[in-house]
A protein has these predicted regions:
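Intrinsically disordered, low-complexity linker/loop segments enriched in Gly/Pro
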Residues: 116-212
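Short, structured beta-strand/loop micro-motifs enriched in basic residues and often containing a Trp
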Residues: 34-43, 88-96, 194-202
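Short, Lys/Arg- and Gly-enriched loop/turn segments at beta-strand edges
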Residues: 65-76, 117-127, 225-235
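A generic structural signal for residues embedded in beta-strands
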Residues: 60, 109-112, 219
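N-terminal, Lys/Arg-enriched amphipathic/low-complexity engagement segments
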Residues: 30-87
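Short, well-ordered loop/turn sites that connect or cap secondary structure elements
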Residues: 52, 101-104, 211
Length: 248
């Protein structure tokens, strides 16, 4: 469907050191669907959903960080009302994977070239008490008030797609859609890391806006096949999630 928060075509290559790769495309691109992208951990025990060759592009359709919970301003980020928040850590921030890259071995370096990201027709921002770096700010105490959800509509650009589209905050404020991948990585060596809190040299929930189209990500390989995951695609973000979320 068109209501997608993040479809990614990715090129990967690997070796004892990073090297450039020749992009090749299959007649039918392999794909992980949104319904399959419901993992909540980077787990080396997961069965791969795709097997790809080095240099092969593939696509992952993702859920937003709340698995579609936020659809209107009436949907608040109150933990007691959110599915999966009765677990510790919460079952939030779903990712798609793992993807098995043929020939990848422990000690290799996996290169991920982000070719394309397509977002859906809206995103959301949810703020509430003590959420994010500004959650206890004395300068902006309103950011730690009641739970508030903002739905941001997306409009297509001249291309007819969201690739050059606009985010409409209100009648007076808008800005370009600038999507990136919030959570990306491979299965860690020994531990199992959650997709909501886990971070390390293997990747994780990084929320860095530079993980975007045209950029290359380098990740160490700890397991045969690399076991690559991604999710938590954002339509826009500043330098961090100051109130606990970006435009999800």
């Amino acid at each position: 469907g068109k209501n997608r928060y993040g479809d990614l075509n990715k090129v990967a290559s690997f070796g004892d050191a990073p090297y450039a790769c020749l992009v090749t495309r299959n007649v039918v691109m392999q794909r992980i669907t949104r319904d399959q992208a419901r993992k909540f951990a980077f787990d080396w025990r997961d069965k791969p959903l795709l097997h790809v060759q080095p240099g092969e592009s593939f696509e992952i359709e993702t859920w937003d960080a709340a698995s579609g919970f936020f659809k209107s301003p009436d949907d608040k980020a109150i933990p007691a009302n959110r599915p999966g928040f009765d677990r510790h850590p919460p079952l939030a921030n779903p990712i798609g994977g793992p993807v098995y890259i043929e020939g990848a071995e422990r000690g290799d370096v996996l290169l991920i070239d982000i070719e394309d990201i397509e977002v859906g027709d809206y995103s959301w921002v949810a703020i509430g008490p003590k959420r994010g770096p500004l959650g206890e700010s004395t300068r902006w105490p309103e950011l730690s008030g009641e739970h508030t959800t903002k739905i941001i509509k997306h409009t297509p650009g001249p291309s007819g797609t969201m690739r050059d589209g606009t985010m409409q905050f209100n009648d007076k404020i808008s800005w370009p859609i600038t999507p990136f991948i919030g959570t990306i990585g491979v299965a860690p060596d020994r531990e199992v890391a959650t997709s909501i809190d886990g971070q390390g040299m293997w990747g994780g929930n990084l929320d860095i806006r530079d993980v975007a189209v045209g950029n290359r990500i380098h990740l160490p390989v700890f397991h045969e096949g690399a076991l690559f995951y991604l999710g938590d695609v954002h339509a826009s973000q500043g330098d961090t999630e100051y109130t606990g979320t970006a435009a999800e």
